[in-house]
UniProtKB/Swiss-Prot annotation:
It catalyses: [ThiS sulfur-carrier protein]-C-terminal-Gly-aminoethanethioate + 2-iminoacetate + 1-deoxy-D-xylulose 5-phosphate = [ThiS sulfur-carrier protein]-C-terminal Gly-Gly + 2-[(2R,5Z)-2-carboxy-4-methylthiazol-5(2H)-ylidene]ethyl phosphate + 2 H2O + H(+). It comes from Cutibacterium acnes (strain DSM 16379 / KPA171202) (Propionibacterium acnes). Its EC number is 2.8.1.10. It comes from the Bacteria. Disulfide bonds: none annotated. This is Thiazole synthase.
Length: 277
């Protein structure tokens, strides 16, 4: 098998989370969409196979059509506990989701405050421990602290989901070093969650070694949600292929891509030679 074939094979490897087998590494959210028709077209354009839905919004009426869209396109629903501030509320919401949707999957969110929407690590760890003990497949939304991410893995979470930046800010990945540390230490999938604003940032997440990217606002609030969904799909694929293909090492000094043998005029000066005449 050629190097090209090996890289393609590695980049095409399915993502496994719990009992899920996903060929798309782009996970979509539904928050922020103003039109069910646009949301549906964006989800299809993204190629996603797993999409989050906030259970606190689950009610009869327009929100029901989200589940109809997912069923129509065979997209797995990932209920989340968005809006929960305590472990108790998150556990209650997860149990309601299991009863309503007949699934053990849950994206666990326990936020500290409305201004940052960042996780409360104490409540998050408490909720994760109890949900795992009750046979939930927990995908935990966490901050970019490698210690907390490792703790969640040790508790039995099926995936850890560090934030690139606060939800909805579009600030991208504020601490790529910490994301790399989380990836290097993890033995479960790492999913970059929150903060993505454009396609290049989704690519960067995959280049850093994340196994998938979850985003919502970057698509639902874009000027052209369907076009942005397509861009995100390609960005995740490109980032994954770049990661598995292996980037060149960074160097302090230039290195010519072509040999200097056979140069007709001039000479090559070393880095210490003076350029002045």
């Amino acid at each position: 098998m050629s190097c090209d074939e090996k890289a393609a094979t590695s980049s095409d490897e399915p993502l496994r989370i719990g009992g899920l087998r996903l060929t798309s590494r782009l996970i979509m959210g539904t928050g922020g969409s103003t039109s069910m028709d646009t949301l549906e077209r964006a989800l299809v354009a993204s190629g996603t196979q797993l999409t989050t839905v906030a259970m606190r919004r689950f009610a009869a009426g327009p929100r029901q059509s989200v589940f109809e869209i997912l069923q129509r396109h065979r997209i797995t629903a990932l209920p989340n506990t968005a809006g929960c501030y305590t472990a108790r509320d998150a556990i209650l919401t997860a149990n309601l989701a299991r009863e309503a949707l007949d699934t053990n999957l849950v994206k666990l969110e326990v936020i500290a405050d409305e201004d940052t929407l960042l996780p409360d690590p104490v409540e998050l760890v408490n909720a994760a421990e109890q949900l795992v003990a009750n046979d939930f497949v927990v995908l935990a939304y966490t901050n970019d602290d490698p210690a907390i991410a490792k703790r969640l893995e040790d508790l039995g979470c099926a995936a850890v989901m560090p934030a690139g930046a606060p939800i909805g800010t579009g600030l991208g990945i504020l601490n790529p070093h910490n994301i790399e540390l989380i990836v290097d230490r993890a033995n479960v999938p790492v999913i970059l969650d929150a903060g993505i604003g454009t396609a290049s940032e989704a690519t960067l997440a995959m280049e850093l070694g994340c196994d998938a990217v979850l985003l919502a606002s970057a698509v639902t609030r874009a000027h052209n949600p369907v076009g942005m969904a397509q861009a995100m799909k390609m960005a995740v694929v490109a980032g994954r292929m770049a990661r598995t293909s292996g980037r060149i090492p960074r160097r302090r000094l230039a290195r010519a891509s072509s040999p200097f043998d056979g140069i007709i005029t001039g000479r090559v000066r070393g880095p210490r030679e003076n350029d002045s005449l």
